[in-house]
Amino acid sequence: MGVSEQRFKLKTNLKPAGDQPKAIKKLLENLRKGVKEQTLLGVTGSGKTFTLANVIAKYNKPTLVVVHNKILAAQLYREFKELFPENAVEYFVSYYDYYQPEAYIPEKDLYIEKDASINETLERFRHSATISVLERRDVIVVASVSCIYGLGKPEHYENLRIKLQRGIRLNLSKLLRKLVELGYQRNDFAIKRATFSVRGDVVEIVPSHTEDYLVRVEFWDDEVERIVLMDALNRHVIKEVEEYSVFPASHYIAPRPTVEQALKEIEKDLIERVKWFKSQGREVEAQRLYQRTMYDIEMIRELGHCKGIENYSRYFDGRKPGEPPFTLLDYFPEDFLLIIDESHMTIPQLRAMYNGDRSRKEKLVEYGWRLPSALDNRPLKFEEFLERINQVIYVSATPGDWELERSEAVVEQIVRPTGLLDPVVEVRPKMNQLENLVKEIKEVKKRKERALVLTTTKRLAEEIADYLTERKIRAKYMHSELDAIERAQLIRELREGSIDVIVGVNLLREGLDLPEVSLVAIMDADKEGFLRSYQALIQTIGRAARNIHGKAILYADRITKAMEKAIQETQRRRKIQEEFNKKHGITPKSIKKPVKELLAIEELDYVSVPEELPKGVKSEEDILKKIEKLEKEMWKYAQNWEFEKAAKVRDEIKKLKKLLGLD
């Protein structure tokens, strides 16, 4: 059961065009020469993802793509999945739907207990990613910055797997014990991730990374007679296999001897820390730490886990104090390729993770809520992250100075295959700017296109949205106080045409495709600061670069250095594209992209109301209740072996989920 050597197969009818062939060739040349760090400077709409897909296919190395948020990760995951249907394309983001970290505020003597809700679907994706990385080389993992957080020792995860093979001697009871040790639970009634059921000489296992199929293991005496992968719902045989690896139900599982040794070390460190608190005359902290830690030790000894077990991860991993945690990067082979997308945003996030985490935990340790080992349950420091890089491509329309200084090569991708030019940029005075804005948006409306308006404050965003609404323009505002569900719904409304304009402070500068947007209006463009920096202006102007009528209006009474640089760069890119179009006889065309592509799995618990609701259903909440009811009905049929009825109900559930964008 070695690592699969299957090659990447890029499936597409498209051929590289514009600057793509040149960029692909140069990036590959650099990689093959051993260049460690390089940058792909690709303008919005130039097809950077397609370029990267070609590089991945030709270079043929396991690849990790890191982006700065879940929505962009999901968009890239979906695009790579379509381009590489025969290869392992995986999605690795934080599995929390809700997360309130443990904290202590000494000024108020207030302890906040950790509270979290884990999304089982995202947890399945994470297991699927680590299993693919360990079992095959034709793998692309698209991850958020959560990939630098502790994940458990890869050696334990890999070595503890149960290797099933047809014909091997294996006692059925021993297999059941092993499954329990790996964190699997017996469940003879429902099909759930990381469970198993037993009927006579047959064990059925639902793996940790999927609920689509189950593994049926048939015994004859003490021998594995047959291993079959079956459809989890209708129990049809998918295929019979010679071997199958069952991986642990958690990334944090450790062998029993390791656990026993870890508990001894925890107790030893506890005694020393309690002694230290007492020597400082801090009896309350000493007593608190002793009681809490001894309770955790007993829970781990009896049940194999406790609340907040990650705070003891250093002991289970065999790490010394201060040593970095194991992360997703440690699961990859040494020759992996790293791609950091939207690097000007992702790099600062990677830098900031460690300090933010440490300041919170130091208080917990200082006041006796946690042992000092809690400080080692942390994300990687930025320097530690860099040490784990083999070869990296930074990707951005506006790379940061840090990436550019480190890169041995900067590969430009300015020309778009569609022939689309960068938006026309106009600077207009602030006087009567709102009247001018209304006039421009009405022109956009006539063409059935959309607009984005950027302000400098949340209050101004709301006021402008109200002003536009009063003038019969369908406008809504977006700012940081809106949660991700509301933001996702707003984007969908804009793309579908339910609204004409979104007004906001920091509007979707990076990544998301909004081909319907032909106008970007930047209010107070001459106010210097982060939101009006060169990078911010280029990214914002780029939001209108996927439409043939793309235009950016900068309302300002003076031209700042950032504005001047952004305008010059946009004009330079327009000129390059114009010359290319003229030379090759290309007529620019707007990008067309179905709206459904925008928000399918970005947040797996996010929903949006369909235009036409099913009969008897009045709201999105009703649909969710209906799905829940049908799922119970489906499993009831399945348990009674009425698979045809179960399949019909499953199809009905699929239709409802599709309406909600959850398909």
Swiss-Prot record:
InterPro entries membership: Helicase/UvrB_N, Helicase_ATP-bd, Helicase_C-like, P-loop_NTPase, UVR_dom, UVR_dom_sf, UvrB, UvrB_inter
Membrane-crossing residue ranges in chain numbering: none
Gene Ontology MF: a single term: ATP hydrolysis activity
Sites where the protein binds ATP: G42, V43, T44, G45, S46, G47, K48, T49
GO cellular component, one term: excinuclease repair complex
Motif mapping: Beta-hairpin: 95-118
Subcellular localization: Cytoplasm
Record keywords, A-Z: ATP-binding, Cytoplasm, DNA damage, DNA excision, DNA repair, Excision nuclease, Nucleotide-binding, SOS response
Domain named Helicase ATP-binding: residues: 29-416
Pfam families attached to this UniProt entry: Helicase_C, ResIII, UVR, UvrB, UvrB_inter
Gene Ontology biological process terms in this record: nucleotide-excision repair, DNA damage recognition; SOS response
Domain named UVR: residues: 624-659
Ranges for domain Helicase C-terminal: 433-599
The family this protein is said to belong to: Belongs to the UvrB family.
HAMAP family named in the record: UvrB
PANTHER family on file: UVRABC SYSTEM PROTEIN B
Functional note: The UvrABC repair system catalyzes the recognition and processing of DNA lesions. A damage recognition complex composed of 2 UvrA and 2 UvrB subunits scans DNA for abnormalities. Upon binding of the UvrA(2)B(2) complex to a putative damaged site, the DNA wraps around one UvrB monomer. DNA wrap is dependent on ATP binding by UvrB and probably causes local melting of the DNA helix, facilitating insertion of UvrB beta-hairpin between the DNA strands. Then UvrB probes one DNA strand for the presence of a lesion.
Domain remark in the UniProt entry: The beta-hairpin motif is involved in DNA binding.
The protein's assembly and partners: Forms a heterotetramer with UvrA during the search for lesions. Interacts with UvrC in an incision complex.
Protein known as: UvrABC system protein B
Gene encoding the protein: uvrB
